[in-house]
Amino acid sequence: MSVLCLGEVWLELNAAAAPELTETFRAQTGGWGAGFCRQYAALGGQAALLAQLGADPFGRKLAARLARDGVDCSLLCFTDAFPTPVVFTGADTALPYRAHTAGLALGPEQLETAPFRGSSAFCFSSAGLVDSPLRLAHLEALAAARDAGT
């Protein structure tokens, strides 16, 4: 079964303590869409991720990690207009830096290449339904998936 996932990807910087109490962070791939696709691929499934990253070192690193983990990254979009989101986590603390970032700027015009007809399932996170271009992309993607019978 092939799955098309519309979701977010961000660089997650994890620490064992609260961010203000540590000097060391571990960089990981974060975001519901990225996590879902990585796990689905690890179980032997085919998962394509439709998301947008900044055309920056963080975005390129995350795309390379996703591809290495077996995720189909052919639908990833990159933009120079916004940076890749970053989230700091540690000791029951989450500090998201998502406002005005690439993931939320993904718009409906970027859905044209999404292969809804070739997918067995379409999944998304309700977190993408915030007031942003990403919300409009979700609404159009849901209509396209319904029309394709996905």
Per-range role (PLM):
Residues 24, 86, 139-141:
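Residue-level signature of transmembrane alpha-helix interfaces in integral membrane proteins
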Residues 29-30, 104, 134-135:
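A conditional alpha-helix N-cap/helix-loop micro-motif detector
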Residues 46-126:
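Conserved N-terminal subdomain of the carbohydrate kinase-like
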